[in-house]
């Protein structure tokens, strides 16, 4: 929380609409949404913070442009879900409360109770928060509309295959337009 006290030092504080805070398994990440381009002084200040506080800082200009890292060296981020390390990006939707997330995923597994013969569909699967743990023992069809999320699920599927000694399931990524009924039949 040391970063909070430094906000007043920024000359362009009015340029920020909000700050997203992401606590990944191993790092703290701040994503600053900005209305206008950062001043060179503020950019330099944020870079110093990132180094001194050992955090990752990203800038999100608007919804049309991708977020960019202030730091030159950004480590991959992960969050752990029921023993599975899932690689994430600050743009991904992640449940902010890790304990609540663990409970939600465990409850989904309890309700569905998938076994080796089960096939589960995870609609709007995101990066695989529910899909990967469910695929430990069953076949999971993870359906997404976003190319980036499909790629994330495919990446996690490959990880699951490498862990085949502890997994009897399978994770399959599908890109579908979920508002198109015909898309679901293909």
What are the functions of these language-model segments?
Residues 20-22, 80:
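Well-ordered beta-strand positions
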Residues 30-31, 61:
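Accessory substrate-recognition/RNA-binding modules or partner subunits associated with SAM-dependent
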